[in-house]
A protein has these predicted regions:
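Non-catalytic, compositionally simple segments
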Residues: 156-291
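Catalytic P-loop NTPase motifs of RecA-like helicase/translocase cores
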Residues: 52, 137, 153-154, 203
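Walker B catalytic acidic pair
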Residues: 148-149
Length: 291
């Protein structure tokens, strides 16, 4: 059991290693970086161009979290149930075939994906569940709230319904600890919210969320993180075809800019969106490959 505890602690600190060893995935550098920050943050905001693989990364995070933290409850909400169900489909159709270990973790009897009831259950009692972003979802509880394309969800619904899900706390047994020791351990593990979306206009509330999270990120006592990636990263990593991007840019103009270009310049108390030039951000230089 000591060996299992050591490996569990190691993989919790290095989720990218878990993806390689257990899920047999070869992640790109930016995916490793984002995955680690997902585990570190209590509030994680990602503004990424379409085609960067937000849903795929969300699926990876949910699986790793549920395996390494038994009894985890993940609720996924989006503008439509179909968009939220895409995360579960990524797990079943893309992640599961690559890993016999993941197949062994999933409780097939309790797993179902349909329009009204979509969830993936794990044998360690963890669950990934799709919820509707409306008043009808009141009563759900979770440790992790994933908001996919959060700009499409009403801010009022997020504040009055979805955020209330996070009143549930994961409570491992800790059989060898006293009640006081258990309480201290429970306090160490915080519930968290993941906000993911493609770029949108500055006058939308989703932009204000980015600014607020950035200001909180500057406070070392808080674990909040925000970043934005433009379409150039997708091309650099081979996720987008440059010719297709050029054609779409010529055809759609401003719509393409809104959906794909999000160079966020952090300048004092504001985030300015620019359409050309390089990205200046307060991140370690070793994250990027300079050529």
């Amino acid at each position: 059991m000591n060996g299992a505890a050591l490996w569990g602690a190691y993989y919790r600190l290095n989720p990218d290693k878990f993806c390689a060893d257990y899920l047999h995935l070869s992640l790109k550098r930016f995916q490793k970086f984002l995955l680690v920050m997902m585990f570190w943050s209590t509030t994680f905001v990602l503004i990424a161009c379409r085609g960067l693989g937000k849903t795929y990364l969300s699926a990876i995070y949910c699986v790793v979290r549920c395996i390494l933290y038994p009894g985890t409850r993940v609720c996924i909400a989006s503008g439509t149930r179909g968009q939220a169900i895409n995360v579960l489909e990524k797990i079943i159709q893309e992640l599961k075939p690559k890993s016999t270990e993941l197949c062994a973790e999933i409780n097939e009897k309790e797993t179902r994906i349909n329009g009204n009831n979509a969830q993936i259950a794990f044998k360690n009692t963890s669950i990934i569940k799709v919820v509707t972003a409306s008043d009808s979802s009141r009563g759900n509880r979770c440790n992790v709230l994933l908001l996919d394309e959060y700009r499409l969800i009403s801010k009022d619904t997020i504040d009055t319904v979805l955020k209330k899900f996070l009143t549930f706390r994961r409570l491992p047994l800790y059989a060898e600890l006293t009640d006081e020791e258990k309480k201290r351990e429970y306090d160490k593990e915080k519930n968290l919210t993941l906000w993911l979306t493609s770029p949108f206009f500055k006058d939308h509330w989703s932009y204000t969320k980015c600014v607020d999270t950035y200001n909180a990120m500057l406070d070392d006592s808080r674990r909040q993180f925000v970043c934005g990636f433009p379409y150039e990263l997708s091309i650099h990593e081979g996720l987008l075809d440059p010719e297709i991007v050029a054609d779409e840019m010529a055809e759609r103009g401003a719509q393409f800019i809104c959906a794909h270009i999000r160079n966020q310049v952090f300048d004092g108390d504001t985030i300015q969106v620019v359409l050309s030039g390089s990205m200046h951000c307060k991140l370690p230089s070793e994250v990027y490959v300079n050529k």
